[in-house]
């Protein structure tokens, strides 16, 4: 796990990113301002999984929780997921962010739709900028960890 948590990542002011090497987001993510009391975690995502270092989703919420626990700089803070659609709930299913909140026992703030980051670090959600960040709290719906 320590090898995953230390290899192929970009250190952020308060968090980390894991995008493919040639992805423009490797530059843009560095301009995003940190959010007080939140640890930023950035990579490609979907409502059910994230892509650690790749465009394809390859990591479950529980595996990412384990990576975060081993990451330098994470001291139990809340998480801001800068990963597309990780806060999007499909019907009554649990979304990625909700499962991550359950696994870590902290609040996870995640986008409801596609996340865009400008070269100046400006974030907007949804093609029409009509998305939002949603806060998921641990065991919010009474599910066991």
What are the roles of these predicted feature ranges?
Residues 1-78, 125-145:
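Glycine-rich short-loop/terminal segments
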Residues 79-145:
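Active-site-proximal C-terminal subdomain of hydrolase catalytic domains
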